[in-house]
């Protein structure tokens, strides 16, 4: 369910684009992203960092897209967000006792330190590559192809990557804790 909630602004963007074009889709994504952050706050009394970072950039680059009537700004948004995640993940190797992925999953899984490090680096590399792929599609294909890639391409790539990570974790897990929070 959380996965659908996380992808809801992208799905709304996609539907709005198919019916009304890039500018209405951009405005819709801005509104839905703000609603997403608000709903999460109302339900859990805290902010999900991923949602807030995405909201900041959708509002900033979405505004530029609408004011300057140029879709390149909104097309760059995924790359900027992906690269921020990559930098934060990579940087977590040097700041703090544990990597970011370790901090996020340590309550559920016990892994050797080297495995946590590899997982963290693989996520950083994944986000770096997603950012590059987004730019490749932006500059080599039309807007319709980019919108389809943004929803379906990144979704499939993310699911395949998560599946690969699950196999890697299962192979190296010392103790799986079945807490669901």
Swiss-Prot record:
InterPro entries: YciB. Belongs to the YciB family. This is Inner membrane-spanning protein YciB. The gene is yciB. Plays a role in cell envelope biogenesis, maintenance of cell envelope integrity and membrane homeostasis. NCBIfam families: ispZ, PRK00259.1-3. Keywords: Cell inner membrane, Cell membrane, Membrane, Transmembrane, Transmembrane helix. It is a multi-pass membrane protein. The chain crosses the membrane at residues 8-28, 53-73, 76-96, 121-141, 149-169. The keyword Iron-sulfur does not apply. Pfam families: IspA (PF04279). GO terms for cellular component: plasma membrane. It is found in: Cell inner membrane. The keyword Secreted does not apply. Its main location: membrane. It comes from the Bacteria.
